[in-house]
Amino acid sequence: MTKALLTILLLLSIMPSMAEVSRENAPLSLLNEIQYSPNLTTAGQPSEEQFRAVAEAGFQRVIFLAFTDHKNAVKNEDRIARSAGLEFVHIPVAWDAPTTDDFDTFAAVMRATEKTLVHCEVNFRASVFGFLYQVIYLGTPAEEAWALLTRIWIPNETWKTFIVSALAEKGIEYPGV
């Protein structure tokens, strides 16, 4: 009886830390969420409430890739993210004209190892940037990263051209996935 009671007390004492570990790796239930790696998740626009959940899940930084005037933008997103304890980085990427300079700016921010949520309006821009970062900087096979990306959408010609250009600029041939 005493041994069983001690076992129960031991289990109860470690359960909060086990919950913390599972919360840090659990999906956030964000629009079109993709977890590319433990430190890189992309998604569509989070709500004000979801920014707190992002911080509670162990993220340290949010990168916003859309413009602040899109119809689903959260007003004062920068202040909301900061008040949740998140670093906020805004890299506005034109939907119809993404540039490799946009991606290079993104990659420079990503080189720090903080757990990062990258988002835009519906996770189209962000998923492409996540794909490119995984392939170019983390050595993820293109087919593997592409499979994650295409769970959300099939890039249109503008974005396929951008992908080819960004890969070519880094000396990587587009695998035609």
Each model region followed by its residue ranges:
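Positively charged n-region of N-terminal signal peptides that target proteins for export
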Residues: M1-A4
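Short cysteine clusters
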Residues: C120
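Cys-dependent protein tyrosine phosphatase-like superfamily
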Residues: M18-L117, V128-V177
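Substrate/cofactor-recognition hotspot
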Residues: N123
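N-terminal signal peptide c-region/cleavage motif recognized by signal peptidases
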Residues: I14-M15
